[in-house]
Swiss-Prot record:
Protein name: Large ribosomal subunit protein uL1
Gene: rplA
UniProt record, GO biological process: regulation of translation; translation
Function statement: Binds directly to 23S rRNA. The L1 stalk is quite mobile in the ribosome, and is involved in E site tRNA release. Protein L1 is also a translational repressor protein, it controls the translation of the L11 operon by binding to its mRNA.
Organism of this sequence: Stutzerimonas stutzeri (strain A1501)
Subunit structure: Part of the 50S ribosomal subunit.
Cysteines joined through disulfide linkages: none
Length: 231
């Protein structure tokens, strides 16, 4: 059996196996045991009572976290005319059409979010093999194909997270950084849960939100007592 490192021992001493933690207690404990040389993210995993093999039970969408993610988000926008001016005014890092597409085909993909107006999809459609594997392809279901590109840019910059159930029916996303106030982090998670419940498929039966687990980038996962969350 492999020996535990000092850090693993310290974590094991503080965490009770099988316990469900009140959200703010979990956030504070995870911050305490964080001992890496970079600022870790807080990540959430939410097990949903859906059958991801059925297309009508795939849950996907986007949530603007009220307190942001703590990350600097780079946004590229495909649009033209007044939309281009509005996108730049809203804080977009790069706005263009064919010129932007050429840059991306050439490997310039240093963006976290790509947004497009509907009239720009003729250009964006050429980039499926470039943007798709990186999760950057604009999609109307998560608000990244929209005539209101300015609002989409503001939402992305403010800390919007996009989510989709994986093959096991689990939603994974970052909800903040270690160093966030626990109450602010809780508000972010509650906003996400509220949207997930709004998007519950009509064909989903039984318990919908089955399990909520909070972790840090390099840390353990703690199961959250859902009674400690208001959503």
């Amino acid at each position: 059996m492999a020996k535990l490192t000092k850090r693993q021992k310290a974590i094991a001493e503080k965490i009770e196996s099988g316990k469900q933690y009140a959200f703010e207690d979990a956030a504070k404990l995870l911050a305490e045991v964080s001992a890496v040389k970079f600022t870790e993210s807080f990540d959430i995993a939410i097990n949903l009572g859906v059958d991801p093999r059925k297309s009508d039970q795939v849950v996907r969408g986007a949530t603007v976290l009220p307190n942001g993610t703590g990350k600097t988000v780079r946004v590229a926008v495909f649009t033209q005319g007044p939309g281009a001016e509005a996108a730049l005014a809203a804080g977009a890092d790069r706005v263009g059409m064919d010129d932007l597409a050429a840059e991306m085909k050439g490997g310039d993909l240093n963006y976290d979010v790509v947004i497009a107006s509907p009239d720009a999809m003729r250009v964006v459609g050429q980039l499926g093999q470039v943007l798709g594997p990186r999760g950057l392809m604009p999609n109307p279901k998560v608000g990244t194909v929209t005539p209101d590109v300015a609002t989409a840019v503001k939402n992305a910059k403010a800390g919007q997270v996009r989510f989709r159930t994986d093959k096991n029916g689990i939603i994974h996303t970052s909800v903040g950084k270690v160093g966030f106030d626990a109450a602010a982090l809780k508000q972010n998670v509650e906003a996400l849960l509220s949207d997930l419940k709004r998007l519950k498929p009509s064909t989903s039966k039984g318990i919908y939100v089955k399990r909520v687990t909070l972790s840090t980038t390099m840390g353990p996962g703690l199961v959250i007592d859902q009674a400690s969350l208001e959503a």
